[in-house]
């Protein structure tokens, strides 16, 4: 199945506490959530683990964000944009921006 938002895409948060922030998708957590670099950060308390060499303390961590709260960044318009799909003549299915019809770079 074709995904509208993939790993490596540059996105804009369109709603929530981080509205307007831009970041890169690190991975898809599941069908409905993505992990975005520098967005939706939370403080997590980590226990020290001398065996693994981990020092304890409070760590900032990226948390998953729902896919409905993000939109793909369109470099041509410099704004967040919706994504659609288009079948090419050679049979490939590609992602396109809804506003201007340009192909999304893979």
Swiss-Prot record:
CDD domains: KOW_RPL26. GO terms for cellular component: ribonucleoprotein complex; ribosome. GO terms for molecular function: rRNA binding; structural constituent of ribosome. Keywords: Ribonucleoprotein, Ribosomal protein, RNA-binding, rRNA-binding. It comes from the Bacteria. One of its GO terms (biological process) is translation. Belongs to the universal ribosomal protein uL24 family. One of two assembly initiator proteins, it binds directly to the 5'-end of the 23S rRNA, where it nucleates assembly of the 50S subunit. One of the proteins that surrounds the polypeptide exit tunnel on the outside of the subunit. Part of the 50S ribosomal subunit. This is Large ribosomal subunit protein uL24. It comes from Dechloromonas aromatica (strain RCB). The lineage of its organism: Bacteria, Pseudomonadati, Pseudomonadota, Betaproteobacteria, Rhodocyclales. The gene is rplX.
């Amino acid at each position: 199945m074709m995904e509208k938002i993939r790993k490596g895409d540059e996105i804009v948060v369109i709603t929530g506490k981080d509205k307007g922030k831009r970041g890169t998708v690190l991975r898809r957590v599941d069908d409905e959530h993505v992990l975005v670099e520098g967005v939706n950060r939370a403080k997590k308390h980590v226990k020290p683990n001398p065996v693994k060499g981990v020092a304890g303390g409070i760590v900032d961590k990226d948390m998953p964000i729902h896919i409905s709260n993000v939109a793909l960044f369109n470099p041509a318009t410099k704004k967040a944009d919706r994504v659609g799909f288009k079948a090419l003549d050679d049979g490939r299915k590609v992602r396109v921006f809804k506003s201007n019809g340009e192909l999304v770079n893979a």
